[in-house]
Amino acid sequence: MVKVERLLINYKTLEEFKKFREYGIQELSMLEDLESNMIENDSNSPFYGIYYGNRLVARMSLYKVDGKSNQYFEEGQDYLELWKLEVLPGYQRNGYGTMLVEFAKSFGLPIRTSPRVKSSDFWNKMGFTPVKYDMARDKGENPLVWHPASEPSQSSESA
């Protein structure tokens, strides 16, 4: 049985991330993010993943954003930023991406993401909707948002 788990910030995870870089799009690389967290000795990892056996096959980063800097949801509303969701080739279309997004939704907070690859069908299926583009706010990205009011929360654990 596979499950979503918080990834440790260590050299083993760094090696696993290098495997994604071999297959992935440069924009999805999380290597630099992980290295900076290692340098800062940040024990509260924003990285989550799914292992198939001993191999990391899917991952994402998930950051909680303070409501004071919220430009997408109700004023003062904390929300999650879901970044760099990626599933290795050969493991795609097995529900791993869906598991990661459902895990993020389980926190019961609104979610913002900026998909980088042709994945609009996936995000639509997951209940995400586009926001009205604002050049100053969105800076060339095409953000999508999900509101928890549309689905029941499963957990109150913090990201």
UniProtKB/Swiss-Prot annotation:
<dbReference type="Pfam" id="PF00583">
    <property type="entry name" value="Acetyltransf_1"/>
</dbReference>
<feature type="domain" description="N-acetyltransferase">
    <location>
        <begin position="7"/>
        <end position="151"/>
    </location>
</feature>
<dbReference type="GO" id="GO:0016747">
    <property type="term" value="F:acyltransferase activity, transferring groups other than amino-acyl groups"/>
</dbReference>
<dbReference type="InterPro" id="IPR016181">
    <property type="entry name" value="Acyl_CoA_acyltransferase"/>
</dbReference>
<protein>
    <recommendedName>
        <fullName>Uncharacterized N-acetyltransferase BLi01727/BL05157</fullName>
        <ecNumber>2.3.1.-</ecNumber>
    </recommendedName>
</protein>
<keyword id="KW-0808">Transferase</keyword>
<keyword id="KW-0012">Acyltransferase</keyword>
<dbReference type="InterPro" id="IPR017274">
    <property type="entry name" value="YlbP"/>
</dbReference>
<dbReference type="InterPro" id="IPR000182">
    <property type="entry name" value="GNAT_dom"/>
</dbReference>
